[in-house]
Amino acid sequence: MEEIIKPVSKELLKAELTEDRRLRMTNKSNNQIYIITHQNAPNVMREIGRLREIAFRAAGGGTGLSMDIDEYDTMEHPYKQLIVWNPEAEEILGGYRYLLGTDVRFDEAGAPILATSHMFHFSDAFIKEYLPQTIELGRSFVTLEYQSTRAGSKGLFALDNLWDGLGALTVVMPNVKYFFGKVTMYPSYHRRGRDMILYFLKKHFNDREELVTPMEPLILETSDEELRTLFCKDTFKEDYKILNTEIRKLGYNIPPLVNAYMSLSPTMRMFGTAINYEFGDVEETGILIAVDEILEDKRIRHIQTFIESHPDALKMPCESEGVFTPKVVTPQEGCCH
């Protein structure tokens, strides 16, 4: 396990966080969203790598290297880094990395070069019909000091701030129809609790088209019969109550991102779970969320607010009319919002 690098100078960070790289202000806490790459902001990238490694190690994952920066961050056409910057404290409080489907390159075998390609197989239907309109998200993190269990009020809106950034992306890139990402669970999480969560997700969000499948699917340790007996209700709400109660009995909580993604859209697709052997053996569950099926309150909070404050963002030489009109979507009652 390598020693993590020292913090990058705030002056170096501020010099690279220029106005042309600023996307928006957040709805809460008056923080700023920036988009950078390794090439145009190498010092910010080093600080992101440092903060990611600290956060992931604390949760039981990480690379074990001095900072979490890989070839997908540094390649010729790299993943972009979306970060939340606290201008008052002059520090990064969280981030995602992302790649537009239209920017994806393919290897000699015709497989997409994605950070998840070593864990998941992407069907021809996904590559042709979904990928060109998809943003792949990864490496989501909240800096340790801003995680709500440690930070109190200042960490309360960290994840909310990040989603303000993702909401803005759907405005400035109106061809984007889907977010493809992963829910990460760590080996330290209770095994039976993990099995209950994954069974619940499969029951209510399973992708029957097999658009994306894990190359080595995770095998649950709890019997299918036991889980089927436990989650025997007809509705999401009733099964969710069971899940929440059983997880609490174990002395755990449902991971915040699991709750957060379920509360974004009732039509989320779950693609199964694979072990990421390159990242501390964490367990990665693939998911897909359709932008126009995000629940209205979330759409207004993270997308509509950006449109109202940045009307020029819609004045672009592509058809954006109707892009933000969501389908009629009924919330999953009983989920944590």
Curated annotation (Swiss-Prot):
One GO BP annotation here?
lipid metabolic process
The UniProt catalytic activity note for this protein reads: a (3R)-hydroxyacyl-[ACP] + glycine = a lyso-glycine lipid + holo-[ACP] + H(+); (3R)-hydroxyhexadecanoyl-[ACP] + glycine = N-[(3R)-3-hydroxyhexadecanoyl]-glycine + holo-[ACP] + H(+)
Q: Which Pfam families match?
A: Acetyltransf_5
Q: For this UniProt record, give its keywords in alphabetical order, as a comma-separated list.
A: Acyltransferase, Lipid biosynthesis, Lipid metabolism, Transferase
The knockout note for this entry states: Loss of production of monoacylated and diacylated glycine lipids, as well as other lipids such as flavolipin, an acylated serine-glycine dipeptide. Cells lacking this gene also show a strong growth defect when transition from growth in solid medium to growth in liquid medium, and are much more sensitive to a variety of stresses, including exposure to bile and air. The deletion mutant is also affected in its ability to colonize the murine gut, particularly during the early stages of colonization.
Tell me, in a sentence or two, what this protein's role is: Is involved in the production of glycine lipids (GL), which are phosphorus-free membrane lipids important for fitness during growth of the human gut bacterium B.thetaiotaomicron in vivo and in vitro. Catalyzes the first step of GL biosynthesis, i.e. the N-acylation of glycine via addition of a 3-hydroxy fatty acyl group, to form a range of monoacylated glycine (also named lyso-glycine lipids or lyso-GL). Is important for the ability of B.thetaiotaomicron to adapt to stress and colonize the mammalian gut.
Protein name stated in the entry? Glycine N(alpha)-acyltransferase
